[in-house]
Structure formats: structure tokens, C-alpha cells
């Protein structure tokens, strides 16, 4: 176990005195209608939470955690789930809240939930009853906030959830292909809470309940607000002075008084003199009461280098131990972002997960099936956070790098509750995990380093020597869980971070022997160094070592088990040659991927910055700094995705065309080292038929007469125009030429 952390909160999450409404006790379900409020004896709600998801009273759903957390503080909390946003009526169905509206788009970003990576409309929604699409608007945070303001203009609105969290500064918006303002500015909300919201939510709720106006609540960690100038007592520094990662301060020598002098001369005895004892106030740390001024919205919108620079600074100010506040100008106002909240302790995590969740959807949904709930109803979340720092992932920016783990007893109690209370349980726990399967109880072994480090990843390019990689707590948890009465199997469905797992082969043996249901998913993401370096993912050497150990231990256990690798196509830094090499690797290892994913530029991710700017925010940014190749355009993104499914005949024409253009025609054929077969006679005939039926491309310069022609007429006219001027005329006799 690691040492006691130096990053400590000012007060415990559950140390606030309960609000007077605690006398009502916990509700069976948080009410979604006036009828339910009447049954509870409530005349009003203190807080109303508006969400784009169906209400499932389960700790895997953000609104359930926030609602039950506030309820435990004594507040009366109502839920408005997936309201009709066409008018304000649905937002008034629970009446006027006494304190504030809490607004979130849901567990997923509403745009990612609605559109694919190719900007195509999805036709399902896993967070909606019966998987029905279209029950939430695009940019749901903005729309819901506007309706709340229409319904009750004087009630504060506080934003939260992943959508608002990743849009707290000026950000690139993939769907409109432009830089948008902070969602706090666009929505005109009163406050934004980013990341996991328990600490700021509880503090703000109690301060509002004590009569403090929301306009004066400006010092809460994990919140963003609109200000006209910097907060009083804070000193600022321009971001252009900080475009380098912070350093870990050296740890003082415990016997510093006995160190030799620089010139190696003997130390003369010091003359002892009596001195008055004076009490010195503690020296402020360099990051306390300090803010970083980021380039303004107007500047980052017009200058991609400044955008990349601002993104780099933001990602280096995410350690709650040493992060400074951030300030970014939007017009004549500033978005002020306070430092991140202190992570929850194990005791606080246990208390959050011990709240009286029913672990089922609200009865109002009847027998409707909610796919997101079906996926997690027999799973247990054992930790939060991720120190992997993958460039394309937003978990680190949302939940933080410091792992927040529950105790063994808390997890075991939840497994027993599932066994005893959840309908349809068959004895199989579908997952014990979190953002990553094997980071439970892992954290920095040096409290001083943990407090001051600004590394983006604790495991890239190499595992930090301060990082604990002992998987014994996880192994002990697995063993205790599977020994419970009535538990037949404990599966691990969360992704395994294999570069950490190989540091402790005992974990791989435990996993392969007892906790894999035939297939284990891991995510190498790519095989080539170019894209891997931009993703901040380990090389294939770690994958090969993990596979060797996994296969060995599976064989020892007498089991036939396989690894299912996940890959990303079209990620910044990926050239066509890289994708061809990946496809060849897949074919060599006989992988035929069914589901593949093109890179999806989500707000705030480092990879999204690369996609938009063509610069690498993982290194120092400048106008002459490294340029990153970015595969853009529908055709190139389709090609990269097609190469992951090299075995699909529908992709062969596109792959052949690309291989020929790259000078790799030798990869087309029937030999074992070829990627795709040569076209058949029937394929060539079909291609010719399609070419005959194509219509010539029209531009604004095409004559109107040609534009109005039918394809057959246009083809005839085109063939006529291509003939010589004197075609069809009788040839003159040679003798007549000289006349």
C-alpha cells in the first residue's frame, strides 16, 4: 500500500450538517412526478436534476449518484428525465425548485450519442427505454438550460456531466468543424461543475441553503464561473510563460545537516548562540492563489497554434495537488476555472456506493428494456480514475489520474446485494472494474511526487518508478468475491491495461485461470510507432509479452481462451502505410475484426487538438514545432477503416485502389503474403458496367443545355463532341487537294 497522500480535502464529504428536510427520510425512488411528491409528503423540491438519460437508480448512472448524494445531505431531490424540449412545460412539472436546477446531457455526450464518427445519424440510444433514438436534443446541455431559464428565470442553473465538463473552455467542435465558446458562456448557466461532482455539488447546495447567493460562490474547486476580472487575492501568470511540463521537486535529504560542503572541506563546528524563537507562517506553495491566463476564445478560434498551446496548458493543470486556476477571455468577460477537486477517500467512496440505490429503472418505465442498464445491472464499479493518459480518451480529464478505490468490504457488500435483491440474477457477476480493470488500489508511492507531478501519463513512455504496480489487492478481491455463497462466476469485462499487468504476472495468472469467459478484450489500438506515439500507448512488445503469459496460464488451466484486440483507425499521426502494416499484422495473426472504430474527435482530448491544429500538444508548441499528419476527408477515413476489415469483400476495391496508388501492387493476389485477392472477371465486368452508368460531374461552368440533358442524351452529346470536326464527311480525292 502507498503512503498517506498529501492531497487532502478541507472537510469530509459527509461532515456537513444535514438540511432540515432530512426528516422526510430517503425516497424509494427520487420522484419524477407531482403524484410521487405528494405520496412522499413534499410540497416542493429543493433541487431538480434534469438529465438526457432515462432514470435508473443505480450507481453507474450519474444522476442517481448525484440525487442520492444530495438526498443523504437532507435535500429533497426530483428528477426530470428526457423531457420534451419543444417547450418549457415539461421543465415545470415538478414545480419550482427552492435552490437550483442541475442540468446534464446524461452519461454520454449528446452529440456522440446521436452521431457516428462519420457524422452519420444513429438510430438507437442505449440510455433510452426500448433503445429508441431521438429522445434528447443535440447539444442537450444548451437546450435544457434554456428551457429551465424560460420556466423559472430566477432559479440558478448548474451544469454538470461529461458534455459540460469537456466543454468548459473554448473547444473544437467536430460536428460543426469550428471552435466554439465555453458551454458556460453559450448556455448562460450560473455555474459549471466538471469531473466527478460529489464534492462541489454538496458544498454549493449547502451554501445556497444557508442563503449565500450563487453569484458569490466563486471559490469551490471543480467549478467554473463567469467573471469580469480575476478573483481578489489571486495573482496571474500568462500561459506563454508556462509551455513546459512542471517538474517534481527533489525530496529533501533526511540527514541534510550532515552533508559535506561543495568543496569537500571538513565542516567546522558551529558556534552555538541563543536565538529567539519566532513562529513563521507556512510558506505558500507556488500554485496556491495563482491563475493562468489562457489565450482568449477569439485568439484560439483564429490561430491553431494558440489553440494547441491552450490545450497543452489545460492538460498540465489537472493535478489537484498543484493545479492552478485557469482564466480565458470570451468577449468582455472571462471564464474562471477553479482547480480540480480533491479525490474521494476510500471511506468516502464506500459511503457514496452505500447509498440506498434500488439498482433498477424507475417503475414509470414499466417493462421497457434500457440497454445501458442491461449491460451493467450485474456489474460492480470498484474504482474511479485512470493514470493511463491516452490522448484520444477523456476519462483522465473527467475523473482524474489519481485512482479512487473502494474497500474490499464495500465491494463484497454490493455483490451480496446484487445476489439478494436484483431480479434475474443467475450467479454471474458480469464485471468487477471501472475505467480500467487492473488499476484498483494502484497509486503513486511518493506522496511528494503525487502532489507536484504534471506528467500526462504515469505509464508512457515508460512506467514511472514512483507508480505502484502491485496487483495483490486486486487478486485478493477477486478471490474473496468468487468464494461468496451463490456466486458462480466473476467475469472481468473492463479493459485490461496489459503494460501494467505484465509487471505482475500473478495477476495475469489469476485472470486467465478464473475470470475470463473465453475472450478477453484489450486495446493495443495500433501496431506502428507513428500513431502509438501520438496516442501515448505502449508498443507491441508489451502486447506480445502479455499474450505469451496469457496463453501459458490459460493452457495450464486447461482452457481455450483468446485475446480480442481493439484498434483505432484514422487517428492523427496515422499514414496509409501504417494502416496497411496493421492490416498485414491482423492477417498474419488471423484476426477478422467485426466492429471497428474510426477516431472520434471528442472535445478536450489531446488527439482532437492534433486533429484540428495539426500540431502535437504532447510537446512544446510553437509555429515551427512538429506537424502531425492527420488523415482527413471521407475517402481517407473510409480507407483506414476498410483496412481494419481487409477480409470483407466489400472493401477490396477501395483497398486495391489504395495499394496501387502506394506502389504496393504486390500485396494484391492469391499468395499468402498478399492482403487482398486480385479482382475476378465478374468484378471487372461489374466495374465497367458501373462506369458506363455514371453521369459526368457538373460544375457551375457546365453549360445549362448540358445540365438539362438526361444521362443518355448527355452521353450521346459527349461522344459527339469528342469526334473530330470533319468526322463523317466524305474525303476529297487526293488530286483535288491542290486546286
Swiss-Prot record:
It comes from the Bacteria. InterPro entries: Elp3/MiaA/NifB-like_rSAM (IPR006638), Methylthiotransferase_CS (IPR020612), rSAM (IPR007197), rSAM_horseshoe (IPR023404), UPF0313 (IPR022946), UPF0313_C (IPR024560), UPF0313_N (IPR013704). Residues 372-650 form the Radical SAM core domain. Residues 704-724 have a biased composition (Polar residues). Its cofactor is [4Fe-4S] cluster. Binds 1 [4Fe-4S] cluster. The cluster is coordinated with 3 cysteines and an exchangeable S-adenosyl-L-methionine. SMART domains: Elp3 (SM00729). [4Fe-4S] cluster binds at residues 386, 390, 393. PROSITE patterns: RADICAL_SAM. Keywords: 4Fe-4S, Iron, Iron-sulfur, Metal-binding, S-adenosyl-L-methionine. One of its GO terms (molecular function) is catalytic activity. The keyword NADP does not apply. Residues 686-739 are annotated as: Disordered. Residues 729-739 have a biased composition (Basic residues). Belongs to the UPF0313 family. PANTHER family: UPF0313 PROTEIN YGIQ (PTHR32331:SF0). This is UPF0313 protein YgiQ. It comes from Escherichia coli O157:H7. The lineage of its organism: Bacteria, Pseudomonadati, Pseudomonadota, Gammaproteobacteria, Enterobacterales.
Amino acid at each position: 500500500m502507498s503512503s498517506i497522500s498529501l492531497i487532502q480535502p478541507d472537510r469530509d464529504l459527509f461532515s456537513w450538517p444535514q438540511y432540515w428536510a432530512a426528516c422526510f427520510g430517503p425516497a424509494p425512488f427520487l420522484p419524477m412526478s407531482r403524484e410521487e411528491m405528494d405520496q412522499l409528503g413534499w410540497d416542493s423540491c429543493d433541487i431538480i436534476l434534469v438529465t438526457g438519460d432515462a432514470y435508473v437508480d443505480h450507481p453507474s448512472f450519474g444522476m442517481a449518484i448525484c440525487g442520492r448524494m444530495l438526498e443523504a445531505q437532507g435535500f429533497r431531490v426530483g428528477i426530470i428525465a428526457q423531457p420534451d424540449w419543444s417547450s418549457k412545460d415539461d421543465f415545470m412539472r415538478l414545480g419550482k425548485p427552492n435552490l437550483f436546477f442541475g442540468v446534464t446531457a446524461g452519461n454520454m455526450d449528446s452529440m456522440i450519442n446521436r452521431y457516428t464518427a462519420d457524422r452519420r445519424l444513429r438510430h438507437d440510444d442505449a440510455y433510452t427505454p426500448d433503445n429508441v433514438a431521438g429522445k434528447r436534443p443535440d447539444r442537450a446541455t444548451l437546450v435544457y438550460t434554456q428551457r429551465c431559464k424560460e420556466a423559472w428565470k430566477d432559479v440558478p442553473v448548474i451544469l454538470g456531466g461529461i458534455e459540460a465538463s469537456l466543454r468548459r473552455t473554448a473547444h473544437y467542435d467536430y460536428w460543426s468543424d469550428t471552435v466554439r465558446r465555453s458551454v458556460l458562456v453559450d448556455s448562460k448557466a450560473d455555474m459549471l461543475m466538471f469531473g466527478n461532482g460529489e464534492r462541489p455539488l454538496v458544498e454549493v447546495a449547502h451554501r445556497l441553503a444557508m442563503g449565500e447567493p450563487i453569484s458569490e460562490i466563486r471559490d469551490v474547486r471543480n467549478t467554473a464561473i463567469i467573471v469580469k476580472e480575476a478573483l481578489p487575492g489571486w495573482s496571474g501568470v500568462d500561459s506563454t510563460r508556462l509551455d513546459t511540463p512542471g517538474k517534481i521537486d527533489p525530496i529533501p535529504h533526511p540527514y541534510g545537516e550532515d552533508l559535506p560542503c561543495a568543496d569537500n572541506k571538513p565542516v567546522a563546528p558551529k558556534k552555538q548562540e541563543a536565538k529567539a524563537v519566532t513562529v513563521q507562517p507556512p510558506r505558500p506553495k507556488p500554485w496556491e492563489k495563482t491563475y493562468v491566463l489562457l489565450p482568449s476564445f477569439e485568439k484560439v478560434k483564429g490561430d491553431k497554434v494558440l489553440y494547441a498551446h491552450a490545450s497543452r496548458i489545460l492538460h498540465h493543470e489537472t493535478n489537484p495537488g498543484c493545479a492552478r486556476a485557469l482564466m480565458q477571455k470570451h468577449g468582455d468577460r472571462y471564464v474562471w476555472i477553479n482547480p480540480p477537486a480533491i479525490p474521494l477517500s476510500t471511506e468516502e467512496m464506500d459511503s457514496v456506493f452505500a447509498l440506498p440505490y434500488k439498482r433498477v429503472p424507475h417503475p414509470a418505465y414499466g417493462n421497457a428494456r434500457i440497454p445501458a442498464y442491461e449491460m451493467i445491472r450485474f456489474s460492480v464499479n470498484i474504482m474511479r480514475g485512470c493514470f493511463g493518459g491516452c490522448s484520444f480518451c477523456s476519462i483522465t480529464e473527467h475523473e482524474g489520474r489519481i485512482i479512487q478505490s473502494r474497500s474490499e468490504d464495500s465491494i463484497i457488500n454490493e455483490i451480496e446485494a446484487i445476489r439478494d435483491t436484483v431480479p434475474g440474477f443467475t450467479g454471474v457477476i458480469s464485471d468487477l472494474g471501472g475505467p480500467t480493470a487492473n488499476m484498483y488500489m494502484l497509486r503513486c508511492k511518493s506522496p511528494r511526487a503525487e502532489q507536484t507531478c504534471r506528467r500526462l501519463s504515469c505509464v508512457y513512455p515508460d512506467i514511472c518508478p514512483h507508480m505502484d504496480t502491485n496487483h495483490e489487492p486486486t487478486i485478493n478481491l477477486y478471490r474473496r468475491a468468487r468464494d461468496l455463497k451463490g456466486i458462480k462466476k466473476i467475469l472481468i469485462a473492463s479493459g485490461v491495461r496489459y503494460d501494467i499487468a505484465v509487471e505482475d504476472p500473478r495477476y495475469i495468472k489469476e485472470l486467465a485461470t478464473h475470470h475470463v469467459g473465453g475472450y478477453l478484450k484489450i486495446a493495443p489500438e495500433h501496431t506502428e510507432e507513428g500513431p502509438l506515439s501520438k496516442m501515448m500507448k505502449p508498443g507491441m512488445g508489451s502486447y506480445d509479452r502479455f499474450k505469451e503469459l496469457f496463453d501459458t496460464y490459460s493452457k495450464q488451466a486447461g482452457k481455450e481462451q483468446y485475446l480480442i484486440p481493439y484498434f483505432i483507425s484514422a487517428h492523427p499521426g496515422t499514414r496509409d502505410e501504417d494502416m496497411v502494416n496493421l492490416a498485414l499484422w491482423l492477417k498474419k495473426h488471423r484476426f477478422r475484426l467485426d466492429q471497428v472504430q474510426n477516431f472520434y474527435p471528442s472535445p478536450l482530448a489531446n488527439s482532437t487538438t492534433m486533429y484540428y491544429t495539426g500540431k502535437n500538444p504532447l510537446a512544446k508548441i510553437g509555429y515551427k514545432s512538429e506537424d502531425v499528419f492527420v488523415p482527413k476527408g471521407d475517402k481517407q477515413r473510409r480507407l483506414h477503416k476498410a483496412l481494419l476489415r481487409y477480409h470483407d469483400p466489400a472493401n477490396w476495391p477501395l483497398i486495391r485502389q489504395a495499394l496501387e496508388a502506394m506502389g504496393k501492387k504486390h500485396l494484391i493476389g492469391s499468395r499468402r503474403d498478399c492482403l487482398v485477392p486480385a479482382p475476378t472477371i465478374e468484378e471487372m465486368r461489374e466495374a465497367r458496367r458501373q462506369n458506363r452508368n455514371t453521369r459526368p460531374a457538373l460544375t457551375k461552368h457546365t453549360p445549362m443545355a448540358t445540365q438539362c440533358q438526361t444521362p443518355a442524351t448527355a452521353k450521346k452529346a459527349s461522344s459527339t463532341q469528342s469526334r473530330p470536326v470533319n468526322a463523317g464527311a466524305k474525303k476529297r480525292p487526293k488530286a483535288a487537294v491542290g486546286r
